[in-house]
Amino acid sequence: DGNITTGLLRATAYVKDNRLLPRGFDKATAAPDIAVIGAATAFFAATMGIAQTDIKKVLAYSTVSQLGYMFVAVGVGAFTAGIFHLMTHAFFKALLFLGAGSVIHAMSGEQDLLRMGGLRRYIPVTHWTMVVGALAISGIFPFAGFFSKDEILWSAWSSGHPLVWAVGLATAGLTAFYMFRLVSLAFWGSERMDHETKRHLHESPPSMTVPLVILALLSL
């Protein structure tokens, strides 16, 4: 799925490059539109993340949402903040996807959050590193995502885009909601997996947990 999606995104980007760049690019005219489109993308993708029960789909929509923040940064002229968020996002999103892989590994391939629950007792390292990733992407102080998102939102406000700022702030709240919904459904509450899956539950090997810990530290 990832290879197909990446291929489509690249093809689209290259086609748009070839069609639009020869005609010129007026920053003064286009920048506000880019900011609005970025804010709308961030918000819409966050609402889609709330509706998902597949752990990988939740993270996929969260990626689209965070890309929306980066477009907001470009639209309001906060290029450094956009690159900063790109870097922080690289670490906590790698952490979250690897953590999701560890969960799926423990669950013998199951990806449905509604069939999980109570996993913190069986995969504690994965649990705590996923909590760190959720805090980082939610923009909770003092984790990495707070500083990069705060810079983007402040730039939107100070450059005279209050609506973009408000949508970005609302999106941050939605992000926190669906990420901790993911953590809650997977790791907390009652166990909802079948007996056979429960019998094989185990923490991932060091080849997976060590990178999780390193990425968690880089997300602080």
Q: Where are the regions that the model predicts?
A:
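Hydrophobic transmembrane alpha-helices and their helix-loop junctions in integral membrane proteins
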Residues: 1-207, 211, 215-219
